[in-house]
């Protein structure tokens, strides 16, 4: 599943414009893409797509700086940006240390520690059939290392 900036997609009942794409490689060799999304009210969300593992997560920034009660650590490691397109605030070669937590209902809490900031997000694991491309759009330049 791959989208380009300018595409319109539907995730569950929400419609979004894809504004950017970041490709990552984890220190364990895993690869995945994250898409920056904007809904009609201007809110930003992120769609993480790992086709290899069959994992799809829609998340949004949160002010919570610690995992909520009932969440358990399920992945910890580092990620390296391998490619970008559209409007994103990272470059190929940037790295972060990450911790992902999950609760029994499939909610995800993530922490990404970059050189210049720490980001916290809450999300939900999705079935891939809940992610639908509505229309294609322009293709922004792709940068990778």
For the regions a protein language model found, what residue spans apply to each?
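Mixed-charge, low-complexity intrinsically disordered regions
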Residues: 1-145
């Amino acid at each position: 599943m791959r989208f380009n900036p300018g595409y319109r997609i539907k995730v569950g009942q929400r419609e979004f414009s894809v504004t950017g794409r970041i490709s990552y490689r984890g220190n364990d060799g895993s690869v995945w893409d994250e898409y920056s999304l904007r809904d009609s009210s201007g809110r930003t969300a992120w769609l993480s797509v790992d086709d290899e593992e069959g994992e799809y997560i829609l998340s949004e920034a949160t002010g919570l700086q610690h995992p909520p009660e009932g969440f358990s650590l399920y992945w910890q490691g580092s990620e390296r940006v391998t490619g970008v397109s559209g409007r994103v605030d990272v470059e190929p070669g940037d790295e972060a240390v990450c911790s992902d937590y999950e609760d029994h209902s499939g909610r995800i809490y993530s922490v990404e520690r970059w050189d210049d900031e720490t980001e916290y997000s809450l999300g939900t694991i999705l079935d891939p059939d809940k992610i639908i491309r509505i229309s294609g759009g322009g293709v922004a330049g792709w940068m990778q290392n």
